[in-house]
C-alpha cells in the first residue's frame, strides 16, 4: 500500500488521534446491542496502546443532524470498550470519556493522557461542522494531537472534518490495521486479481451499481446479477417479468451493458428461474416459476429459483477471486432469503478462492448461513467498498500521507 500505515509511525509518548467507526446499535436503555464494529478495530487500538500512544478516539454514531442528542451519545461505547480492553490488554485499563470532541475540557483531558491510556471523544457529528468539513473545526480536532490514524474504512468515502480535513493540520496521517486490510484486499481484487475473477452483484436497483458494473467489466471473467436489479436486465432482453421491480429509465443502459458484455466475451449471468409472490409481504405465499416460463402478470419475483442457484454456484466454484455485494432476493423476508443464503454457502464453499463480501445484506447472509469464518475478507464499509469497486478515489484514503 502506498500510504503510511500505523506500523510506520513512532507512537511512544505521542498524542494520536484515531478515527474509528463505533457507529453501533444501542437499545432504548443506551446499551450496545452489537459490538462487532468495536471488535473489528480493537487490534489497531491495542497496537497503539501497546506501543505507548496517548490515544484519542473519535467516531460518529447515528445521524444527530449537527446537534447534541443524548440517545446518540458514545458514553455507553466508552463503557463497553473499557470492558473489552480489560480482557485484551490489562485489568483496569482506563478509557476516559470527554463530553465534547472539542473545547477546553477535551483539550485538558487529551493533555493529561499518559502513555498507553485512551480517551474517547463524544460523537463528532454533534457538530454540524463535521459533515461540512469545516476547516476551523478540523483544525480544532487536530489541536488535540500530534499524529493521525484513520481506521474507519466505512467512512472513508466521506470528506468530513474527522476523515479528511484534520489531515491538513497534523504532521503525519496513517492507515490503521483494519483500514490497511480493507485497502489491501480490495486493491488486489481490482488491480491484480487471481483469475478467474467473478463479481456477484445484487440489491434492488441497477442505478446503485452501474458504476461498479462498468468498472468491473474490464477486470472480471464473469458477472452474476441477482436481486431486484436483475429484472431491469431481463426486461431489457424482452422477457415477461410480471409486477417485478425494474427501472424503466435504465432499460437502454441495461441493453448497452448486455451488448458490451457480449462484445467482450464476458459471462453475464442472470436468473433463469424465480421465486415469486403476488405482493411484497413477508407472509406472501412463494411460487416457483420454472426455467423458460414467463412470470405471470400478477406475480413479482422476490428471490432466485433453484436452477439459478445451481447456475450461479457452478460459476462461483470455478473462481479464484470472488467479490460479492448485494442480496439475491428480499433477504429480510425469510420465505425469500433462500437464494441469498445458498449463494453465501457457494462463496464460502470455494476454499481455493479469495472471497470478499461487502454490503449489509450479503454480510448478514454469510453470518446467517454460519459460514462467515470461511470468507477471506468481510468488508466493514458498504458504501466505501462500492465506491472503491467503482474505481473512485476515497477522500479519507487520499488524505493519508504517502509513503
From Swiss-Prot:
Alphabetized SUPFAM superfamilies for the sequence: Phosphoglycerate kinase
GO cellular component, one term: cytosol
Catalytic activity: (2R)-3-phosphoglycerate + ATP = (2R)-3-phospho-glyceroyl phosphate + ADP
Transit peptide among keywords: no
InterPro entries, alphabetized: Phosphoglycerate_kinase, Phosphoglycerate_kinase_CS, Phosphoglycerate_kinase_N, Phosphoglycerate_kinase_sf
Entry keywords, A to Z: ATP-binding, Cytoplasm, Glycolysis, Kinase, Nucleotide-binding, Transferase
Enzyme Commission designation: 2.7.2.3
Annotated positions binding substrate: 21-23, 37, 60-63, 125, 158
Annotated compartments: Cytoplasm
Keyword Oxidoreductase: no
Entry-linked CDD domains: Phosphoglycerate_kinase (cd00318)
GO molecular function: ADP binding; ATP binding; phosphoglycerate kinase activity
Pathway terms, separated by semicolons: Carbohydrate degradation; glycolysis; pyruvate from D-glyceraldehyde 3-phosphate: step 2/5
Residues reported in the UniProt entry to bind ATP: 209, 332, 359-362
Quaternary structure (record): Monomer.
Family: Belongs to the phosphoglycerate kinase family.
HAMAP family referenced in this protein's UniProt entry, alphabetically: Phosphoglyc_kinase
Name of the molecule in the record: Phosphoglycerate kinase
Organism listed in the record: Koribacter versatilis (strain Ellin345)
Amino acid at each position: 500500500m502506498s500510504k503510511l500505515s500505523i506500523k510506520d509511525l513512532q507512537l511512544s509518548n505521542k498524542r494520536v488521534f484515531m478515527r474509528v467507526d463505533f457507529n453501533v446499535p444501542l437499545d432504548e436503555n443506551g446499551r450496545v446491542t452489537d459490538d462487532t464494529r468495536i471488535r473489528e478495530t480493537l487490534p489497531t487500538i491495542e497496537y497503539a496502546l501497546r506501543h505507548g500512544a496517548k490515544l484519542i478516539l473519535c467516531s460518529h454514531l447515528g445521524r444527530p443532524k449537527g446537534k447534541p442528542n443524548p440517545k446518540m451519545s458514545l458514553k455507553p461505547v466508552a463503557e463497553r470498550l473499557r470492558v473489552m480492553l480489560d480482557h485484551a490488554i490489562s485489568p483496569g485499563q482506563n478509557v476516559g470519556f470527554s463530553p465534547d470532541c472539542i473545547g477546553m475540557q477535551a483539550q485538558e483531558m487529551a493533555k493529561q493522557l499518559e502513555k498507553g491510556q485512551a480517551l474517547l471523544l463524544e460523537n463528532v457529528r454533534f457538530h454540524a461542522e463535521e459533515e461540512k468539513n469545516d476547516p476551523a473545526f478540523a483544525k480544532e480536532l487536530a489541536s488535540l494531537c500530534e499524529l493521525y490514524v484513520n481506521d474507519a474504512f466505512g467512512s472513508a468515502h466521506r470528506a468530513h472534518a474527522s476523515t479528511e480535513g484534520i489531515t491538513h493540520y497534523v504532521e503525519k496521517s496513517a492507515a490503521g490495521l483494519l483500514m490497511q486490510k480493507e485497502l489491501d484486499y480490495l486493491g488486489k481484487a481490482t488491480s491484480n486479481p487471481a483469475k478467474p475473477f467473478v463479481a456477484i452483484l445484487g440489491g434492488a436497483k441497477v442505478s446503485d451499481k452501474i458504476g461498479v458494473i462498468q468498472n468491473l467489466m474490464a477486470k472480471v471473467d464473469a458477472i452474476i446479477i441477482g436481486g431486484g436489479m436483475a429484472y431491469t436486465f431481463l426486461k431489457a432482453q424482452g422477457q415477461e417479468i410480471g409486477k417485478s421491480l425494474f427501472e424503466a429509465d435504465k432499460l437502454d443502459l441495461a441493453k448497452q451493458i448486455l451488448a458490451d458484455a457480449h462484445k467482450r466475451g464476458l459471462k453475464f449471468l442472470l436468473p433463469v428461474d424465480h421465486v415469486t409472490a403476488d405482493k411484497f409481504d413477508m407472509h406472501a405465499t412463494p411460487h416457483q416459476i420454472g426455467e423458460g416460463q414467463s412470470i405471470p402478470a400478477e406475480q413479482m419475483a422476490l428471490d432466485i429459483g433453484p436452477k439459478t442457484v445451481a447456475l450461479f454456484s457452478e460459476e462461483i466454484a470455478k473462481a479464484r477471486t470472488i467479490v460479492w455485494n448485494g442480496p439475491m432476493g428480499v433477504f429480510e423476508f425469510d420465505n425469500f432469503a433462500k437464494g441469498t443464503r445458498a449463494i453465501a454457502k457457494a462463496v464460502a464453499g470455494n476454499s481455493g478462492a479469495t472471497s470478499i463480501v461487502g454490503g449489509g445484506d450479503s454480510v448478514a447472509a454469510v453470518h446467517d448461513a454460519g459460514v462467515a469464518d470461511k470468507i477471506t475478507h468481510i468488508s466493514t464499509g458498504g458504501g466505501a467498498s462500492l465506491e472503491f469497486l467503482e474505481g473512485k478515489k476515497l477522500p479519507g484514503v487520499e488524505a493519508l500521507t504517502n509513503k
